[in-house]
């Protein structure tokens, strides 16, 4: 997975950026509402949920994959379904970006959802709203919280490959870099920890954590924050010069359930990804107290996660006459 660190900026620039971004979000997100499709496609949420239920019968990973698509979409020019666009003569697909290539998945299920929605309500529900609805349904179906999904997003007319390479947080980045990337889109530290809790289900490839197993940060030794028992298991699964595509569970204890075990894992140094473990192992970080509170109180985590998903879904949506309602999520209309 490619890692591109954002250039360092002085504090005044960062504060100004956050103020500007926050003011934009306040205007855009206010146009989203929970009843947007009540008169035009009242069964939209039920259609999304039933399609995912069907997909789960043959792919237990699909819920985690769908929420990851929403996350990677929102961090690049906002929640506009740009991640779903294929390459064309004029569009460089975000699917080819380092954080997405050979790892982003679930596009076929998005297409199935969109087909079902088009059959019921032609030209009404946007692909960006499909991702938002699919994320809520995926979490709920895995035993996690439900929340009111705000709707009314429209779809982008292009993609941003460079933005996908630079803006999406990487599992091998430092906590400070990831915190900056969250701040750049108007999300705070509580959002960072809560949304990281989505790693309570799903899988990860050896290629995104094998940097911790043998030669961490050029030391010639494994990551010292990695539990020795887990380290031994992972070294066997992902040997040096082995396949980077081998997958394992993000949460070893309850891999397909949405719960707060992810945070307990961090407390015992059983976080799979560097970016996860740093939430608890970075000395003096404010994230430690948040991890501790979520580990001891699942209800608190669920409440925070639901709110943070709403916050993330409010990142720079296209509304009104901006963008379009794609008829096929893979391509802009008329192409």
Swiss-Prot record:
Residue numbers binding heme b: 199
NAD as UniProt keyword: no
Cofactor binding summary note: Binds 2 calcium ions per subunit. Binds 1 heme b (iron(II)-protoporphyrin IX) group per subunit.
A GO molecular-function descriptor: heme binding
Catalytic activity: 2 a phenolic donor + H2O2 = 2 a phenolic radical donor + 2 H2O
Record-linked InterPro entries: Haem_peroxidase (IPR002016), Haem_peroxidase_sf (IPR010255), Peroxidase_pln (IPR000823), Peroxidases_AS (IPR019794), Peroxidases_heam-ligand_BS (IPR019793), Secretory_peroxidase (IPR033905)
Keyword set, alphabetical order: Calcium, Disulfide bond, Glycoprotein, Heme, Hydrogen peroxide, Iron, Metal-binding, Oxidoreductase, Peroxidase, Pyrrolidone carboxylic acid, Secreted, Signal
Active site per database record: 72
Enzyme class: oxidoreductase
SUPFAM superfamilies given in the database record: Heme-dependent peroxidases
Tissue specificity annotation: Mainly expressed in roots.
Primary site of residence: secreted
Cofactor(s) recorded in Swiss-Prot or TrEMBL: Ca(2+); heme b
Compartments in which it is found: Secreted
EC identifiers of the protein: 1.11.1.7
Site residues by UniProt (Transition state stabilizer): 68
Miscellaneous notes: There are 73 peroxidase genes in A.thaliana.
Protein name listed in UniProt: Peroxidase 53
Organism annotation: Arabidopsis thaliana
Species lineage: Eukaryota, Viridiplantae, Streptophyta, Embryophyta, Tracheophyta
Gene behind this protein: PER53
